């Protein structure tokens, strides 16, 4: 097998930081296996040996046939691990093949990279997003396949944001190719025993592929999304910070993009809006409604401080699978597309649970301990577990207030001045400019938990009666809501929520769920709701004029059936 290697795109300085925002084929520092050193089949030896030769598969039914047979594949000269395969439409997809040591047959794990990146070829990737590393998976008895998605790395074509009809079908061809490998376990001819891991772009593709191809047997998507409408364009408000960041990363590293991507980034940053065509294009990208077609065991891993793909994206996906009795679990950790400003806690948990998930659902080891179905971490690195989500709720912690907010640039949330001392998440330095922070000028409501000593878990609810005026303009009218820990001055989860308002002088009411939180409420420790006029996280709204809130009500959900760790 070809040596795991560093690639030329791993640079230093600000350019490298731009690349790291979505890199996903990553090793946790618990992966300590040595670099594999032997080559294996690249397609000439085809296997029809069934899975029972090596392990027992979980019961399932799948009649998906190969989409291409045989797969047109060509080894890359001087790089034994690399193979170019021809996809359904003639696009060349570069794959990287790292079989487990020895000649036995093993299940295979496909590990997708992050946005703008080629497939990982590193034994231990430095980007600690909680995904599994190649060396660790090889040592655990898995073949590993990574690949350059279309539009990135050495693959041809245009990046289309995990379009089921493009990137989804590309991965189907990779499944076809794996089924032809001599060292791959197959459940029947053309149907390899396959799991998928990866974060961000490499998390989203898992859900898309599993929805269209039943040959996938287990998933561990980290930092994935449900809908690009709710994640990138919440309340019809563009996440301009991330839009610019993602577009810059792709262009910097030579990505070849569908024109809708650059168009949306330019209009989102420049005007604060998307064209109808661009909005519909992003909505059509997976998984969205395709999540209801995913029926394989799935472990969702999401970050409490992820400001790109927030917690609710994982929750919607999780609830779809749970409603259909598909084996699923969910872990929230302090990380993701963002920076953890509090204690990160157990750095090995995600890695251990991910391996256990693959062990149980890919190898068929029923004794593997996959942990609690729901495991979340609070601001003190304390873990809380639950039998399911949503959890049963106790009486909420509530507060009310009123006041006026002048809508000008002095009322702004962010940028963040500095990362937490000693922070080791790779994005700490590169996302400061687009991360919300406590505002110096805001309309505030103090929230006192009283005697409550419990976990606030889920989406706080904000209700407001208001009126106001603002000058005419093309930009949308918005205010933004965030919660601040008064002990530390840190915005809970670094999360801020846009609120669509109408400022025409008429008295109006608005109700909105804020971004989800996991925060330990304790007596004597207050939280403050801040309403601000603008934020670095979203496109600047129309400024000028003021908002007069005659009543603001905020409600924090309090979990009743969670167990502290």
Predicted regions and their residues:
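Short, low-complexity, disordered segments immediately C-terminal to signal peptides
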Residues: 27-56
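Accessory cap/linker subdomain of secreted extracellular hydrolases
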Residues: 58-72, 121, 127-131, 139, ...
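Gly/Ser-rich "nucleophile elbow"/oxyanion-hole loop immediately N-terminal to the catalytic nucleophile
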Residues: 102-103, 158-166, 173-200
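Short substrate-entry loop that stabilizes the transition state in hydrolases
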Residues: 103-106, 111-141, 145, 150-156, ...
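Short beta-strand/loop motif that positions the catalytic acidic residue
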Residues: 294, 300-302, 306
């Amino acid at each position: 097998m070809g040596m795991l290697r560093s690639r030329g795109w791993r640079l230093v300085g600000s350019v490298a930081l731009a690349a790291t925002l979505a890199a996903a084929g990553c090793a946790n520092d618990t992966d300590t296996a040595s670099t594999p050193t032997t080559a294996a089949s690249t397609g000439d030896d085809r296997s029809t040996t069934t899975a029972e030769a090596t392990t027992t598969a979980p019961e399932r039914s799948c009649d998906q046939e190969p989409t291409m047979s045989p797969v047109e594949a060509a080894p890359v000269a001087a790089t034994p691990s690399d193979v170019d395969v021809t996809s359904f439409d003639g696009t060349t997809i570069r794959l990287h093949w790292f079989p487990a040591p020895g000649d036995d047959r093993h299940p295979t794990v496909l590990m997708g990279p992050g946005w703008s990146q080629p497939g990982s070829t590193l034994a231990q990737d430095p980007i600690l997003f909680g995904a599994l590393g190649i060396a660790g998976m090889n040592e655990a008895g898995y073949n590993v396949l990574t690949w350059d998605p279309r539009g990135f790395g050495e693959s041809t074509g245009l990046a289309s944001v995990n379009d089921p009809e493009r990137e989804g079908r590309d991965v189907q061809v990779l499944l076809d190719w794996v089924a032809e490998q001599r060292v791959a376990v197959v459940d029947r001819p053309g149907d390899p025993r396959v799991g998928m891991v990866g974060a961000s772009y490499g998390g989203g593709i898992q859900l898309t592929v599993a929805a269209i191809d039943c040959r996938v047997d287990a998933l561990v998507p980290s930092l994935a999304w449900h809908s690009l409408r709710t994640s990138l364009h919440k309340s019809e408000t563009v996440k301009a910070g991330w839009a610019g960041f993602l577009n810059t990363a792709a262009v910097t590293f030579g990505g070849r993009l569908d024109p809708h991507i650059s168009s949306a980034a330019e209009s989102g940053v420049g005007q604060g809006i998307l064209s109808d065509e661009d909005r519909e294009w992003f909505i059509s990208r997976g998984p969205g409604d395709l999540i209801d077609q995913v029926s394989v065991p799935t472990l969702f891993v999401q970050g409490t401080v992820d400001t790109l793909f927030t917690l609710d994206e994982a929750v919607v996906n999780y609830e779809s699978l749970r409603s259909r009795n598909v084996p699923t679990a969910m872990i929230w950790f302090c990380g993701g597309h963002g920076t953890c400003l509090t204690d990160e806690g157990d750095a090995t948990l995600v890695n251990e649970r991910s391996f256990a998930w693959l062990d149980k659902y890919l190898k068929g080891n029923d004794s593997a301990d996959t942990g609690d179905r729901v495991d979340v971490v609070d601001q003190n690195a304390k873990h809380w577990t639950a039998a399911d989500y949503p959890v049963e709720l106790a009486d909420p912690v509530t507060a009310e207030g009123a006041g006026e907010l002048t809508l000008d640039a002095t009322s702004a949330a962010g940028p963040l001045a500095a990362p937490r001392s000693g922070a080791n998440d790779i994005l700490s330095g590169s996302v400061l400019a687009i991360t919300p922070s406590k505002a110096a000028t805001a309309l505030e409501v103090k929230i006192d938990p009283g005697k409550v000593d419990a976990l606030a878990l889920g989406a706080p609810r904000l209700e407001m009666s208001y009126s106001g005026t603002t000058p005419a303009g093309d930009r949308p009218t918005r205010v933004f809501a965030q919660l601040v820990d008064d002990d530390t001055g840190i915005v809970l989860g670094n999360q801020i929520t846009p609120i669509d308002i109408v400022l025409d002088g008429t008295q109006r009411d608005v109700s909105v769920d804020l971004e989800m939180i996991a925060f330990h409420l304790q007596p004597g420790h207050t939280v403050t709701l801040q309403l601000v006029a603008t934020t670095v996280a979203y496109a600047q709204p129309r400024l000028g004029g003021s908002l007069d809130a005659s009543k603001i009500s905020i409600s924090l959900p309090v979990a009743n059936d969670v167990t502290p760790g």
